[in-house]
């Protein structure tokens, strides 16, 4: 395997913001399965926690926080299975462009929540691979991670 040639002296640290385990297999899953990477999965939608733990057979640390700018926001809760819960109100016209997505983006509840900045998360340290899937809030998340921004080796939005 090509990873054997890398001769890593420590595990790769993967952080996934918006880690809801829905339809697709994350690109880093095999690294976690092979115990080459440690995964920190961050998803503020507490309904997602058990499916994240199940997907990784407990080889994951889950942080149930919404990451943004550290301020209060409206949270637009959509069906758990859709993974579309967001700090941004879904635009039904835009979602209709994608076949069936207007159903996924249907808001079932709105509530006020407090967010945290990426920089305020303790015990994460440097990040080798950052994946962010936050329904349009990706730039806001990265912008509020100034202390960590230059510690990313790879990031994927």
Show the residue positions of the predicted features.
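Phosphate/nucleotide-binding beta-alpha loop and adjacent structural elements of enzyme active sites
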Residues: 1-157
């Amino acid at each position: 395997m090509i990873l054997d040639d890398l001769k890593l002296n420590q595990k790769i640290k993967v952080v996934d913001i918006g880690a809801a385990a829905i339809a697709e297999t994350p690109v880093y899953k095999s690294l976690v399965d092979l115990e080459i990477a440690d995964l920190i999965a961050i998803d503020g939608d507490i309904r997602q926690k058990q499916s994240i733990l199940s997907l990784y057979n407990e080889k994951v640390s889950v942080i149930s926080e919404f990451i943004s700018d550290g301020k209060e926001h409206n949270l637009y809760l959509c069906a758990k299975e859709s993974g579309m819960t967001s700090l941004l109100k879904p635009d039904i016209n835009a979602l209709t462009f994608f076949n069936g997505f207007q159903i996924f983006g249907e808001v079932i509840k709105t509530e006020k929540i407090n967010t945290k900045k990426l920089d305020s998360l303790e015990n994460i340290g440097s990040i080798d691979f950052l994946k962010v899937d936050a329904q349009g809030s990706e730039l806001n998340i990265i912008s509020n991670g100034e202390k960590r921004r230059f510690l990313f080796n790879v990031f994927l939005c």
